[in-house]
Amino acid sequence: MSAVTRCEDGLVLRLYIQPKASRDSIVGLHGDEVKVAITAPPVDGQANSHLIKFLGKQFRVAKSQIVIEKGELGRHKQVKIIHPQQIPPEITALTE
């Protein structure tokens, strides 16, 4: 499975999360996953909620349209984004 997969109602992303980074960013490919750096620490779900907020801004969707399908407690996650309004250039490059 590739890092970015299109489905009938949006995108499915396979992510590798780097918590406690200096800034929030989509770094690029990390093996067969997209590496995302976020500033939040991996404590009490802070990193997950911060990741959802960051992805919501990047894809211009409500937080309720982002679902962590797999990897709630780990760095390797599978996230579904329902009906993205915008796709960041880093992700567009991976879908082509």
UniProtKB/Swiss-Prot annotation:
Cross-referenced Pfam families: DUF167
GO cellular component: cytoplasm
UniProt source species: Salmonella heidelberg (strain SL476)
Protein name stated in the entry: UPF0235 protein YggU
Source lineage: Bacteria, Pseudomonadati, Pseudomonadota, Gammaproteobacteria, Enterobacterales
InterPro entries, sorted: DUF167 (IPR003746), YggU-like_sf (IPR036591)
Family stated for the protein in its record: Belongs to the UPF0235 family.
NCBIfam families: DUF167 family protein, PRK05090.1
